[in-house]
Amino acid sequence: MLFRQVEFSFINVPPSYLVPAGTWQIVLAFAFLLVVAISEEVIFRGYLILRFRTLAGNRTAALLLSSAIFSIGHGYQQSGGVIAVGILGLVFGLVYLWRGSLLAPMVMHFLQNFIGIVLFPLGMQ
């Protein structure tokens, strides 16, 4: 019964009113998504992984906790979106731990958002 009430979808196409119309809106979307990617990576990878690693003394636990919080913060994307975001959070976190820099996760995060929120919906029109 519960599973019938939970919508499960990995592909969440933004509503048409959120899809940029015209060059100016695409430029604004680019800037907005760049700020989102940078700020979320600084918070969830740059800050939380370091804090949780200090508290737990374990980088695996820090990565899992940070990714779980990142995922829960995207709860508006329904269950499939939360799972997908959790997986992306793990990938971004692994890249951060591997490279020791936020630059690669920031670029990956921005590209994922821009393709999914701007380019993919524009291609469907």
Q: Predicted regions span which residues?
A:
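Membrane-interface helix/loop boundary segments of multi-pass membrane proteins
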Residues: S39-L65, L94-S101
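Functionally important transmembrane alpha-helices
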Residues: L64, G81-Q125
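Short, motif-level signal for alpha-helix interfacial/capping segments enriched in acidic residues
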Residues: P14-T23, R53, Q78-L94
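Aromatic-anchored segments of alpha-helical transmembrane domains
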Residues: M1, S67-G75, L111-V118
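Juxtamembrane helix-loop-helix connectors linking adjacent transmembrane helices
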Residues: M1-V36, T54, Q125
